[in-house]
């Protein structure tokens, strides 16, 4: 009797507005999969042999899975978070060992007629675990050891997924660091992340250009200069020590200018070596002063300079030696280094044509020529948004993005109204994952971000991604419903 009353209480406390948005997006997504995978020879959209038929099964099982998750109390996740996390870590390791290679990656485990991608399910495990850890008494991100624990929980599955050669899925886990910012992580960490992106983009974009007639790579020169400027600026912002800031600026920037003039008018040489030496001397100075004056902020600034330099050379090595050819080429196309629209840029170019051909109102359901004639590769998975653009036009695309925007703001509302840290952190984890997927997927279809192969939530064809997103959302809905039950 109590169980029935409890279930009725959960149903009454559920956020049905969010569930309605979920059902709208899932249904809309299925029609888009129908449009993207429709075959004139085999027009049956409900058959198991078609992607639309399979997706209908995934949707049905996802709804059943979500309904079952609503019956599990929050305390189960609280007590089992670490066990779930370790189970997913073991599954990721097993995937590396036994998974067959599919399209260059080893991330799919075949189970009978279907394949599952553990990387999609590891997201909710990480979200639960960091929520559990950050909810412990006395936890603070200001504590270096505790921050390192959270970072390790995020980076471990990320590294395992990279070992599966699934770089796109691994990058999604970086979105968890945005959650930490909401929980009090200093903005310096976000600035460091921004700086790393700038180093990578500038270093790669200008890696083949020389500075005038000197043996100097423009990308390397600019990155070293940026490291100097950022480090000096941080010294002033965090210490307000004008004398130290001025000394570092005159020494580092001054030596760079002198080396540039000497190389231009006397003997040409690679002035990046001088920049590296100057930045190293600056870093050593900061470390020495940190110990002598017992100023922890100087240690952090020195660490920033070390990480910046290390990241630049490491990312350069990874780009040229570790990334697969198709991954490297996609980045080159995005940065304008490679404009081969017949090969590297073919996917994005065809997606743009499909979206542009839709016009204002679109061509109508199942009437898209670009998608029906299979001009757009992966049109029912990674490039599903171009089907919306072609069949439903600008109005349909704008309506979809508006629906996602409402969904995102609703997640913010759910996260903010949680009474404890665990619920709030989990809510923001779900939010950041959805936001990252939405921004990157739509961005790569429009040619604004690299093509890294991540699905559009609730839209892209595939059971693993749909189940993974459903698990993330419905656990949050149960946690939120329990908040209402306690209030009653």
Residues covered by each model-derived region:
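TM-adjacent membrane-interface loops and short helices in multi-pass inner/ER membrane proteins
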Residues: 330-384, 392-396
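Transmembrane alpha-helices of multi-pass inner-membrane enzymes
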Residues: 230-234, 447-484, 488
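Short, Lys/Arg-rich, polar N-terminal cytosolic tail immediately upstream
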Residues: 1-11
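Short hydrophobic beta-strand that contains or immediately precedes a catalytic carboxylate
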Residues: 116, 350, 458-459
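Hydrophobic alpha-helical transmembrane segments of multi-pass inner membrane proteins, especially
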Residues: 21-35, 39-342, 386-444, 471, ...
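Alpha-helical transmembrane segments of integral membrane proteins, especially early/N-terminal helices
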Residues: 14-24, 82-84, 88, 353-363
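Transmembrane helix boundary and interhelical junction motifs in multipass membrane proteins
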Residues: 166-171, 363-368, 379-381, 452, ...
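Helix-boundary and loop/linker segments of multi-pass membrane transporters
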Residues: 10-11, 146-147, 373-376, 418-419
């Amino acid at each position: 009797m109590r169980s029935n009353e409890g279930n009725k209480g959960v149903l009454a406390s559920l956020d049905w507005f969010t569930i309605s948005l979920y059902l709208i997006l899932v249904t809309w997504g299925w029609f888009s999969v129908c449009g993207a995978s429709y075959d004139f020879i085999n027009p049956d959209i409900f058959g198991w042999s078609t992607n639309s038929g399979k997706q209908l099964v995934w949707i049905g099982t996802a709804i059943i899975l979500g309904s079952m998750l609503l019956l599990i109390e929050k305390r189960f996740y609280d007590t089992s978070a670490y066990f779930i996390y370790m189970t997913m870590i073991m599954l990721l390791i097993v995937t590396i060992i036994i998974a067959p290679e599919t399209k260059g990656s080893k991330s799919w485990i075949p189970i009978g007629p279907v394949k599952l991608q553990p990387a999609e399910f590891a997201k909710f495990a990480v979200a639960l675990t960091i929520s559990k850890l950050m909810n412990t008494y006395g936890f603070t991100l200001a504590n270096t050891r505790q921050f390192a624990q959270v970072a390790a929980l995020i980076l471990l599955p990320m590294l395992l997924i990279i070992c599966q050669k699934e770089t796109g899925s691994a990058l999604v886990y970086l979105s968890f660091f945005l959650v930490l910012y909401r929980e009090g992580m200093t903005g310096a960490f976000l600035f460091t992340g921004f700086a790393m992106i700038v180093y990578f983009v500038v270093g790669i974009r200008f890696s083949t250009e020389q500075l005038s007639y000197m043996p100097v790579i423009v990308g390397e020169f600019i990155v070293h200069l940026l490291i100097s400027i950022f480090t000096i600026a941080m010294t002033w912002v965090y210490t307000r020590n004008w004398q130290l800031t001025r000394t570092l600026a005159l020494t580092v920037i001054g030596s760079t200018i002198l080396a540039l003039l000497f190389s231009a008018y006397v003997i040409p040489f690679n002035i990046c070596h001088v920049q590296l030496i100057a930045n190293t001397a600056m870093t050593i100075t900061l470390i020495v002063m940190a110990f002598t004056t017992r100023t922890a902020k100087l240690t952090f600034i020195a660490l920033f300079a070390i990480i910046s330099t290390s990241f630049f050379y490491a990312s350069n090595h990874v780009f040229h030696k570790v990334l697969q050819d198709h991954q490297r080429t996609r980045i080159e196309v995005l940065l304008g280094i490679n404009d081969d629209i017949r090969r590297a840029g073919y996917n994005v170019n065809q997606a743009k044509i499909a979206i542009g051909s839709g016009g204002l109102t679109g061509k109508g359901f199942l009437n898209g020529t670009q998608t029906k004639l299979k001009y757009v590769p992966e049109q029912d998975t990674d490039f599903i948004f171009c089907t919306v653009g072609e069949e439903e036009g600008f109005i349909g695309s704008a309506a979809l993005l508006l629906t996602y925007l409402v969904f995102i703001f609703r997640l913010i509302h759910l996260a903010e109204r949680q009474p404890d840290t665990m619920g709030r952190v989990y809510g923001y984890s779900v939010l950041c994952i959805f936001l990252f997927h939405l921004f990157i997927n739509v961005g790569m279809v429009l040619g604004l971000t690299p093509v890294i192969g991540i699905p559009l939530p609730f839209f892209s064809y595939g059971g693993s991604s749909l189940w993974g997103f459903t698990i993330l959302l419905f656990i949050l809905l149960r946690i939120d419903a329990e908040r209402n039950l306690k209030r009653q």
